[in-house]
A protein has these predicted regions:
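ABC family nucleotide-binding domain
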Residues: 5-226
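C-terminal boundary and immediately downstream tail of ABC-type ATPase nucleotide-binding domains
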Residues: 223, 227-248
């Protein structure tokens, strides 16, 4: 991949929750079109990194620059960044009283000031892309978990982001529903979308990642291309983690 100016840059980022240090001097860059997968044991700081990139958590020290904008206490900056950064969570966070179509159009209409007809056309385009166009008129409670997560992905895409963040998007799903969500994410990766994904799904990571990141104890322990990461990682801690997770 040709070197490009990073669209995400974290420099010496630390984060405290009270006395607990969740992130310790984290340095990470993500280039346009790059797919980065972050893995590591529970409590290693993976989700905190993702949440800091979208300013859902405020970092304590260090510098975070997203798409040329430094994240600071300037709310205008934060609003601008969030319009260009989509996020998909473990939980689907759909509005239960709105139809699927309404869940997808509310952001473009209210935030992007798009007219309703254009927003609905955009929503149908992305429902088609995640392979559930027939669910537009249903309510979230009428859908399976896998379908709800695909709606959540489509909802993020309706904001036409330049970057997509995924925080363990399959961890709340039944096993038989995981692949239908991962398949959509593989297709999205193939389209050239910049993606940062926290996941334990190593088959997915092997398939799409340009760069693997292993975290433990709030620190980045290893960064490597997938072919090296999965066959010959430098750190013993990373090797032990992979031995454990790849057994299952």
């Amino acid at each position: 991949m040709p070197k490009a100016e990073p669209v995400i840059s974290l420099e010496n980022v630390s984060k405290f929750f009270g006395p607990f240090q969740a992130l310790k001097d984290v340095n990470l860059t993500v280039s346009a079109g790059e797919r980065v997968v972050i893995c590591g044991p529970s409590g290693s700081g993976k989700s905190t990194v993702i949440r800091c990139i979208n300013r859902l958590e405020e970092h304590t020290s260090g510098t975070i620059i997203v798409d040329g904008t430094e994240l600071s206490e300037d709310t205008q900056n934060i609003r601008a960044v969030r319009q260009d950064v989509g996020m998909v969570f473990q939980q689907f966070n759909l509005f239960p009283h709105l139809t699927v179509l309404e869940n997808l159009t509310i952001g473009p209409i209210r935030v992007r000031k798009m007219d309703k007809g254009k927003a609905e056309a955009l929503a149908r385009k992305y429902l088609d892309r995640v392979h559930i166009p027939e669910q537009a008129g249903k309510y979230p409670s009428q859908l399976s978990g896998g379908q709800q997560q695909r709606v959540a992905i489509a909802r993020s895409l309706c904001m036409e982001p330049r970057i997509m963040l995924f925080d363990e998007p399959t961890s709340a799903l039944d096993p038989e529903m995981i692949n239908e969500v991962l398949d959509v994410m593989v297709e999205l990766a193939g389209s050239g979308m910049t993606m940062v994904v926290v996941t334990h799904e190593m088959g997915f990571a092997r398939k799409v990642a340009d760069k693997m990141v292993f975290m433990e104890g709030g620190q980045i322990i290893e960064v490597a291309p997938p072919e090296k990461f999965f066959t010959n990682p430098d750190s013993d801690r990373c090797r032990a983690f992979l031995d454990q997770i790849l057994e299952h």
